[in-house]
Amino acid sequence: GDPYIGDHILTINADYYLPTDNTAIPYGPKEKVEGTPMDFRTPHEVGERINDNFEQLIFGKGYDHTYILNKEDNKLSYCARCSSPKTGIVMETYTTQPGVQLYTGNWMTGNFEGKNGQRYPERAALCLETQHFPDSPNKPEYPTTELRPGEVFQSTTIYKFSVE
């Protein structure tokens, strides 16, 4: 079948995202998602605004951004929900991490062959990668990723699948 993820319905529990420069590195303060194609606080098709004339989408040929989750530090909280209207499969994500990177397979070329010879072209996949913020060591305003000797890092992410 057609692997395009543009019809997938996505919700992300975030009021802010980290804008990037044209090398995909966050360059400064967080920005509100409100009024932009970055806004997934309510359900939207992934492909609905992916080709908008919006600098952040032009830089990465689509979504490749960290969203700052609406949550308390280190508390396991709701992060995102993605569903496929074709299959009815739903994925809900919960995490203790402060952010989630949304990536929409913008640089896939069709060279990768998957199960049963299926080729995966541009935007044939969607990733929700829970994480700290990129470039955190160089941005004192971001949550720290420093781990000192004797300290333990622990993180939990749950990907819960169901069918509608």
Question: Which residues does each predicted region cover?
Answer:
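An exposed, glycine/acidic-rich loop-and-rim segment of catalytic or binding clefts
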Residues: 1-164
